[in-house]
Swiss-Prot record:
It catalyses: (1S,2R)-1-C-(indol-3-yl)glycerol 3-phosphate + L-serine = D-glyceraldehyde 3-phosphate + L-tryptophan + H2O. One of its GO terms (cellular component) is cytosol. The active site is at 47 (proton acceptor), 58 (proton acceptor). Pfam families: Trp_syntA. Its EC number is 4.2.1.20. The gene is trpA. Pathway: Amino-acid biosynthesis; L-tryptophan biosynthesis; L-tryptophan from chorismate: step 5/5. Tetramer of two alpha and two beta chains. Keywords: Amino-acid biosynthesis, Aromatic amino acid biosynthesis, Lyase, Tryptophan biosynthesis. This is Tryptophan synthase alpha chain.
Length: 257
């Protein structure tokens, strides 16, 4: 069964644009407003980060957003309860470290997620080899477990991950944490083109994407981008009009590969 997320991300003409926000940054009461704003801006899907005290993959902007949310006592359960009443029509994706999911309980987590518009799950600190901790609970659901793929992964490992991939492949474009960047690894284009050649699902580039030029660059070699730190920072600074314009332009970028 092709997951809803894969169908929504697949677009042969325009780059898929997935945005990231930290759940509860600015207060849980603002979450629905943020989601509806991003949906109106033309994005394909929205990742919602779950605040965690030891966010190993997060750069400084997202770490600060997580701290702001934690100070407001925001939890995974509180976010899922809020999402259960969301009116958003595009797919949502939960990005959480494994600890908050364990704390809530995997069966309860999956049960709660199915009552929301969430169609994807990213767990950055859950290695591919340990996915069976959660995949039995996800079987038969419309929730895609999205793999994170690093630049340094050997080809055999990439093939194995691609074979099992759901939703889309999250191709990490840098060696390091999230954050706004000006430069990417010189081998990134070759890496993405190879991933696209072996993947049955769309391939999206993430970590460091922060300009229309970046979106255009990646539209030549993969199916779209994930934009995180820039979105988090602009929402925090209340630059919604500027952010909305940027995202609308990004969503109009044509795929050239």
């Amino acid at each position: 069964m092709t997951k809803t997320l894969t169908k929504k991300i697949s677009n042969k003409k325009h780059a898929a644009v997935v945005t990231y926000i930290m759940g509860g940054d600015g207060g849980l009461d603002n979450l629905e407003e943020q989601l509806l704003f991003l949906e109106k801006s033309g994005v394909s899907a929205i990742e919602i980060g779950i605040p965690f005290s030891d966010p190993v993959a997060d750069g400084p902007i997202i770490q600060l957003a997580g701290l702001r949310a934690l100070k407001k006592q925001v939890s995974l359960e509180a976010i899922l309860n809020k999402l259960a009443t969301s009116q958003v029509q595009i797919p949502l994706i939960i990005m959480s470290y494994i600890n908050p999911i364990f704390h809530l309980g995997i069966p309860k987590f999956v049960e709660m997620v199915q009552k929301t518009p969430v169609k994807g799950l990213i767990i950055p600190d859950l290695p591919y080899e340990h996915q069976t901790l959660i995949t039995p609970e996800l079987e038969g659901t419309d929730i895609a477990l999205i793999p994170l793929v690093s630049l340094t992964s050997p080809k055999e490992r990439l093939k194995e991950i691609a074979k099992q991939a759901e939703g889309f492949i999250y191709a990490v474009t840098v060696n390091g944490t999230t954050g706004v960047r000006n430069k990417f690894d010189t081998h990134i284009d070759t890496h993405l083109a190879y991933l696209k050649s072996i993947s049955p699902v769309p391939v999206l580039a993430g970590f460091g994407v922060s300009s229309i030029e970046h979106v255009e660059k990646f539209a030549h070699v993969c199916d779209g981008v994930i934009i995180g730190s820039k979105v988090v920072q602009m929402l925090h600074e209340n630059k919604k009009a500027e952010l909305g314009t940027f995202l609308q332009k990004a969503a109009e970028v044509r795929i050239e590969n």
